[in-house]
Amino acid sequence: MFARHLRSGFRFQASLIFLVLLATNLPAVSPARSEDKKRDTPAGPVTQGQRVFSCGHSFHVFVPGILSDMAKAAGIEDHQALGLSAIGGSRVIQHWDVSDDKNKAKEALRSGNVDVLTLSPIHLPDEGIEKFAKLALEHNPNIRITVQEFWLPFDIYDTTFKLRPQTVDHNAPTAEELRKLHEPYFQNMDDHVRSLNKLLGKEALFVVPAGQAVIALREKIIAGQAPGLSTQQDLFTDAIGHARPPLQALVAYCHFAVIYRRSPVGLPLPAVLARANNPNWDEKLNRLLQELAWDAAVHHPLSGVAAGAKP
């Protein structure tokens, strides 16, 4: 049922994604990000445009086009979105299992011309992450693989996908409740990424802490400190939690921060917000989204961004 709901949401997103891609010429701290945890070795800012291939479901597929827009605005002219494998409600293994004659992700990785592979599992374990990582490193030892956290569908943590609430009130949970709810999910992802890096013998996989940035934004909304957003529901199109433009922008900023290891703070209003025809989604909101994304990346020990890095 979850996959069916997400496929429905994916169709809803498809037209918006197409417009964004066309327009961009596409060719509060949770326990899981605690400062007390060991931080993996970060590197400095990435100055060269990255060639990015993405695989994901509808909580991720909007990222490539928006990221291209942001990179261009940041003066990164040689950023390239190489392709997108989009499957509604998918686990990473489903992208791996696409037949070789149609598998654009494998084709791109085998060329050795991919700098960053972005993945977005639903829940773990997901053997597709390891399979893609090994193939990617075989053809480009310097590739980085990012694994995107998400915000829990239906605001519940259920790896069986059997629990389906009759109604979902996204405005109901407090920030503390959201952090507690997401804690095992975040911990599971961090443990999985660390174990894969150990298996691979290098830090090749990095976490994009989008889920934690979303909690921080929801906390700001609850406190009345999010310009242009009155309720938590303003972030979502439906009960599952498909993203409206402000949430899409936040997630893309998280990817920008992790991929380029530099702050998005100060970038102009992205097309995804500018073309939404909502005057409340302005530069003040944009600045907040940038700050939250950067803060999440800086404080996550697996993002690859140096702790204490300045905006």
Question: How would you describe each model-predicted region?
Answer:
Residues 1-10:
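N-terminal secretory signal peptides that target proteins for export/translocation
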Residues 13-27:
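Bacterial N-terminal signal peptides
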Residues 28, 32-34:
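Boundary at the C-terminal end of the N-terminal hydrophobic targeting segment
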Residues 35-50:
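N-terminal low-complexity, Pro/Thr/Ser-rich intrinsically disordered segments
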Residues 50-55, 59-142, 299:
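Conserved SGNH/GDSL esterase-like catalytic core that processes O-acyl groups on lipids
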Residues 106-248, 257-259, 266:
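Alpha-helical cap/lid subdomain in secreted, periplasmic
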Residues 224-311:
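Conserved catalytic region of serine esterases and O-acyltransferases that act on ester linkages
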